[in-house]
Amino acid sequence: MSDNQDLRIAVLGVGIMGADHVDRITNKIGGARVTVVNDYSLARAEEIAALTPGSRVVVDPFDAIAAEDVDAVVLATPGPTHEKQVLACLEAGKPVLCEKPLTTDADSSLAIVKAEAALGKKLIQVGFMRRFDHEYTQLKYLIDSGDLGRPLVVHCAHRNPAVPNGFDSAMIVKDSLVHEVDVTRFLLDEEITSVQIIRPSANSLAPEGIQDPQIAIFETESGRHVDAEVFVTTGVAYEVRTEVVGELGSAMIGLDVGLIRKTKPGNWGGQITPGFRERFGQAYDTEFARWIKAVKTGAGTGNYIDGPGAWDGYAAAAVCAAGVKSLETGQRVVVDMVARDSVAGA
C-alpha cells in the first residue's frame, strides 16, 4: 500500500475506548480512515458512524472483518469475544490491533500465537499502550543505556478513582494489573516466573465483595523483584507510577511532572490526573500512528505490527492466570507458560 492511500479500518466495539479510537483515526492521525463501525448495540454503532464521514454500520462483527472495504481491524470489543474475532482476522489475512486481553485465558492465547506463527506473518498487535507513553519510553531508554546500572527492584502503583458496575476482585488482576505485567516484561526484557497476590485491609468504600487494594509481587527469570500496588476504588484520581531501582541509581515516572531520577536533581508536583485518557492520550495516539504505518508497509516483510504482539498477549494471560490463582489461595504461584522458542515463528 502506498503512503498516499488511506488504510481502511473497521472498528469493532465503540464504547468509550472504541469511540475514542474512531475519533483518533478520523481527526488526529493521518493515513487511515474508518470505513466500518460495529457494536453489539446497533444504536451506538449508528451514533458513532453518523459522526464519522465515509463510514457505515455492519451489524455482524464477522461480516465487518470480512468486508471488502476493510484493510485492517481494531478490536475494542469485550474480552470474551476476542478469540473468535482475532482468529477471523487471521483467516481473512487482515492485520488487527486488539485491545487487551488478547483472550481471556492462556490456552486460547497460545492457540492464537500458534495460528499466527503458522501463517508466517505478524498480523496481531495487542493494545498495551504504555509501551508508547513518552515517560515509559524514557524510562526504558534509561535502563537500556546503563545509567542506572543493573536493575534490581521495580515498584509500581496503579490507582483508579472508581470501577464500573460488575467489577470483581479477579478483574483487578486481569484488567488492571495486566498493565504492570506488560510493562515489567517491556522494561526488563524477561519473563515473569511467579506471582503472589497479597490481600491487605480492604477499602470499606469499595463496592461490596471487592478485595481492593491488592499487592502483587512478581519474580522474573533473573530473580528480580517487582511489587505492584493496585487500588482501583480510590475515589480520587488516576495514578500510574513506576520506579526502577538499579545498582547505580533510581528513576521514577508517573508523578505528573515527568521522569524523576535520583542520579540527578529532580522535582515534585502536586497535580492529579482524572482518568486514563488524560494520562495516556499521547500513548494511544503514538500507538495508532505507528501501527497504521506498520500495516501500510508490512507487505514487503510480512510484519504488520510495531509493538507488542500475540506472544506478549499470551505471556500476560499466563501471568494473570497465576495471579488469579494466588488471589484465591494467598500463595506464591509459578507461572505456567511454554518457552517462546518452542513455537517456531512466535
From Swiss-Prot:
One GO-annotated biological process of the protein: inositol catabolic process
GO molecular function: inositol 2-dehydrogenase (NAD+) activity; nucleotide binding
EC number: 1.1.1.18
Keywords, sorted A to Z: NAD, Oxidoreductase
Domain of life: Bacteria
Record's catalysed reaction(s): myo-inositol + NAD(+) = scyllo-inosose + NADH + H(+)
InterPro entries, per database record: Gfo-Idh-MocA_inositol_DH, Gfo/Idh/MocA-like_OxRdtase_C, Gfo/Idh/MocA-like_OxRdtase_N, MI/DCI_dehydrogenase, NAD(P)-bd_dom_sf
Oligomeric and partner information: Homotetramer.
HAMAP family given in the database record: IolG
Described purpose of this protein according to its UniProt entry: Involved in the oxidation of myo-inositol (MI) to 2-keto-myo-inositol (2KMI or 2-inosose).
Family: Belongs to the Gfo/Idh/MocA family.
Listed name of the protein: Inositol 2-dehydrogenase
